[in-house]
Amino acid sequence: MLYKNINEFEQVIDKTKRIMCLDFGEKKIGVALSDKTNLIAIPHSVYVRKNTRKDLGGLYGILIENDAGSMVIGLPLDLFGMGNELCDKVMLFANRMIKKYAINIYLHDERYSTAMATRVAKLANIKRKESQKIDDKIAAVLILQQVLDMVKIYQM
């Protein structure tokens, strides 16, 4: 099922499984996973997109291999919180993933995540050429950590 409300998503999370996060892009998708306690976001990989069918299978494979039970996908709203063409593509992708694999997906506002990822890399003295290779998975980590922190608050 697709969730836009963190409180509703928190109620359906399988606490025995990890959570996977995607920073969705036209050419690449950043992937991050929670640790087994669902407290810490860990970078996983940058998935290079092929076509929708292969992308669905490849990303679902990562989910299964890492014993994840649900997914977070960054929703790239504009600066005013409005949807755009990429948001529509994210929604379509999420709905296809749900239809094919029956998993719970939470869409999280990812405004500024790529800019923050670039800044994190810069602060870590990673050269721009190198950071471009990892920005997507850093962005996925930042998105997932926000969600994990929000879930932790709802569980208190």
From Swiss-Prot:
Q: Which EC class is this protein assigned?
A: hydrolase
Query: Chief localization class?
Result: cytoplasm
Keywords recorded for this protein, A-Z: Cytoplasm, Hydrolase, Nuclease, Ribosome biogenesis
Task: List, in alphabetical order, the Gene Ontology terms for molecular function in this entry.
Answer: nuclease activity
| Entry's localization field | Cytoplasm
**Family annotation (SMART domains):** YqgFc
Q: Reply yes or no: does the keyword Nuclease apply.
A: yes
Physiological role: Could be a nuclease involved in processing of the 5'-end of pre-16S rRNA.
- What name goes with this protein? Putative pre-16S rRNA nuclease
Q: Per the UniProt entry, what species is this protein from, by scientific name?
A: Ehrlichia ruminantium (strain Gardel)
